[in-house]
């Protein structure tokens, strides 16, 4: 899974508490840090965009079927893999799924759905790329991630807190 930054974990539930887990973690971290952008790009291969689904919204409310597409299924992801794709980009809008300051907590049900879709992708041995998509469009109701608005300190705080939650959720 790729977010804004590349990361990987060994999947151990011991949180690195034993020597083997620490060795596994070091090996995985070493493998990722030794890859340059060209190598990563080659490894990820041809990608497919799962657009107009998790970034679809109406009146500032994200909903994967609001633009007329069906619910994302694992069968869809399997069909994508069968066509030879190795990577799936999953654009996601958060908009009103983000709570108020100071925590800006993302709605757990929405994050669970994003997780489910990411799990379809990763579970089929594909790379997943997720982003924040549409939250900065001037044409999208309730967009908040706009670089020319006067409240830049608030926007930066919200951006950092939202990405921290996404990164924490998908770190493994």
Task: Give residue ranges: language-model regions.
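A cross-domain feature marking catalytic cores of carbohydrate-active enzymes
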Residues: 48-52, 90-94, 130-136
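Bacterial signal peptide processing site
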Residues: 9-11
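N-terminal carbohydrate-binding accessory modules
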Residues: 16-87
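A short acidic, helix-capping loop that chelates divalent metal ions and anchors anionic groups
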Residues: 57-58, 97-101, 138-139
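C-terminal motif of bacterial Sec signal peptides marking the signal peptidase cleavage site
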Residues: 4-7
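An active-site-proximal structural segment forming one wall of the substrate-binding cleft
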Residues: 28, 68-88, 102-134, 138-172
């Amino acid at each position: 899974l790729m977010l804004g930054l590349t990361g990987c974990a060994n999947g151990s539930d011991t949180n690195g508490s034993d020597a083997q887990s620490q060795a596994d973690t070091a090996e995985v971290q070493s493998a990722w840090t030794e890859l340059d952008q060209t190598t990563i790009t080659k490894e990820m291969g041809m990608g497919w965009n799962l657009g107009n689904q998790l970034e679809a919204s109406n009146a500032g409310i994200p909903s994967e079927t609001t633009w007329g597409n069906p619910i994302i299924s694992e069968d869809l992801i399997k069909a994508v893999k069968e066509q030879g794709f190795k990577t799936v980009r999953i654009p996601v809008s958060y908009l009103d799924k983000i709570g108020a300051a100071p925590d800006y907590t993302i709605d757990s049900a929405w994050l669970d759905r994003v997780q489910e879709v990411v799990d379809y992708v990763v579970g089929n041995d594909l790379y997943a790329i997720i982003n924040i998509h549409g939250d900065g469009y001037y044409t999208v109701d309730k967009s908040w991630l706009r670089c020319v608005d006067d409240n830049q300190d608030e926007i930066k705080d919200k951006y950092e807190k939202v990405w921290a939650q996404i990164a924490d959720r998908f770190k493994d």
